[in-house]
């Protein structure tokens, strides 16, 4: 599934293409996609395909096409502080992007059938937290993953504001999925080969919208034990954050506000006025035409009166542009102002590193 947009050279170019094709339509979703490099969730030997609009599967590891994830993120209408359940959470790529929008007071849970995939997802999550240049720009709702079949979730589990299922849902399981939602909640899932958005408008009232045609592998049916009983999946508890954790969130938030105020004071509106460099135009001095006549091929050139002096003209044009245009300089590497501020605080080093989530940069 995929191939709806052109491949990108890097993550940003892929996002540009998804925006141009109207798969990404809102700023929050765009920011989340740009913050997490899709290639980081690929095995090293397959990273050359990371920026293509194609699904990828290797063993139990699977990623949907970027255009599908874009539609899912837009349809979920995510907001800070909501609770999210990802059924078939896989590599954790989608859950991590969702966590950037939910913020520190959201709930971010995932259920994955394969334990090896959960280990893979935890490794990728740890890598993102430790090394990403984008992590400190957001307040992150870290996802929690449990192993199990999403069709065996305990009936006394909490309901969620947003639910996504990453496998094809059979019609017989539609009601089961809908019951995972709070009133006012949104469920997005592949149903009868259509990516479907279902909004719970009341205790027994629903609105359904078909988004686009998709092809997903169907949900794997539960395997019952010898006693005939299914193994109920217990979702992670919705725990209250510790006072220490709340203090870290508050301190980081205060520092971010100070940085923002300093930026506004320094740059007026907070936006840097970066110089624009004029690109040198390449002028074509001649045109070649090829004519097919029966089996013969004829080539001709339409000359320009300035052909004879083309080299001199181009050299003169180059010199003029060099005089007018200031030399281009490489952009400075991004500065993590939050990290700088924290490290400058009169605090013990262990506390500083706690405030920085023990990140490497």
Curated annotation (Swiss-Prot):
Protein name as catalogued: Protein-L-isoaspartate O-methyltransferase domain-containing protein 2
Region (CUL-box), start-end ranges: 345-348
The family this protein is said to belong to: Belongs to the methyltransferase superfamily. L-isoaspartyl/D-aspartyl protein methyltransferase family.
GO biological process: protein modification process
GO cellular component, one term: cytoplasm
Main location class: cytoplasm
Region annotated BC-box, chain positions: 240-250
Gene: PCMTD2
Bias (Basic and acidic residues) ranges: 321-331
Organism the protein comes from: Homo sapiens
Locations listed in the record: Cytoplasm
Alphabetized GO MF terms: protein-L-isoaspartate (D-aspartate) O-methyltransferase activity
Function per UniProt: May act as a substrate recognition component of an ECS (Elongin BC-CUL5-SOCS-box protein) E3 ubiquitin ligase complex which mediates the ubiquitination and subsequent proteasomal degradation of target proteins. May bind to the methyltransferase cofactor S-adenosylmethionine (AdoMet) via the N-terminal AdoMet binding motif, but probably does not display methyltransferase activity.
Sorted UniProt keywords: Cytoplasm, Lipoprotein, Myristate
Acidic residues bias (residue ranges): 309-320
Location of region: AdoMet binding motif: 85-94, 160-164, 181-191
InterPro entries: PCMT, SAM-dependent_MTases_sf
Lipidation (N-myristoyl glycine): 2
Disordered: annotated span: 303-336
Domain of life according to the entry: Eukaryota
Domain notes: At its N-terminus, contains L-isoaspartate and S-adenosylmethionine (AdoMet) binding motifs. Also contains an extended SOCS box motif, where the Cul-box is separated from the BC-box by ~90 residues, within its C-terminus.
A Pfam family it matches: PCMT
Active site annotation, chain numbering: 64
């Amino acid at each position: 599934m995929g191939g709806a947009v052109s491949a990108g050279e890097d993550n940003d170019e892929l996002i540009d293409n998804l925006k141009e094709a109207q798969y990404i339509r809102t700023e929050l979703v765009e920011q989340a996609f740009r913050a997490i490099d899709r290639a980081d969730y690929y095995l090293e030997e397959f990273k050359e395909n990371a920026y293509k609009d194609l699904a990828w599967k290797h063993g139990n590891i699977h990623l949907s096409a970027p255009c599908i994830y874009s539609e899912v993120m837009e349809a979920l209408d995510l907001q800070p502080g909501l609770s999210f359940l990802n059924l078939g959470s896989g590599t954790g790529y989608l859950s991590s992007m969702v966590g950037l929008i939910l913020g520190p007071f959201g709930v971010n849970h995932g259920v994955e059938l394969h334990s090896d995939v959960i280990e893979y997802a935890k490794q990728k999550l740890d890598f993102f937290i430790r090394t990403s240049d984008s992590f400190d720009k957001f307040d992150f709702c870290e996802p929690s993953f449990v192993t199990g079949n999403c069709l065996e979730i305990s009936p006394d589990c909490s309901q969620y504001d947003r639910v996504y299922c990453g496998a094809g849902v059979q019609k017989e399981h539609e009601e089961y999925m809908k019951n995972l939602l709070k009133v006012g909640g949104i469920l997005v899932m592949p149903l009868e080969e259509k990516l479907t958005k279902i909004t719970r408008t009341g205790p027994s009232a629903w609105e359904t919208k078909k988004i686009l045609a998709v092809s997903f592998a169907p949900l794997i049916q539960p395997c019952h034990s010898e006693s005939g009983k299914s193994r109920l999946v217990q979702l992670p508890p919705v725990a209250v954050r510790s006072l220490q954790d709340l203090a870290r969130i508050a301190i980081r938030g205060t520092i971010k506000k100070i940085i923002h105020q300093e930026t506004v004071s320094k740059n007026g509106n907070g936006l840097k006025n970066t110089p624009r460099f004029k690109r040198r135009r390449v002028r074509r001095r001649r045109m070649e035409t090829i004519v097919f006549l029966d089996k013969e091929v004829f080539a001709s050139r339409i000359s320009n009166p300035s052909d004879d002096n083309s080299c001199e003209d181009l050299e003169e044009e180059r010199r003029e542009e060099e005089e007018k245009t200031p030399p281009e300089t490489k952009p400075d590497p991004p500065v993590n102002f939050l990290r700088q501020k924290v490290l400058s605080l009169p605090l013990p080093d262990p506390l500083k590193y706690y405030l920085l989530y023990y990140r490497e940069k």
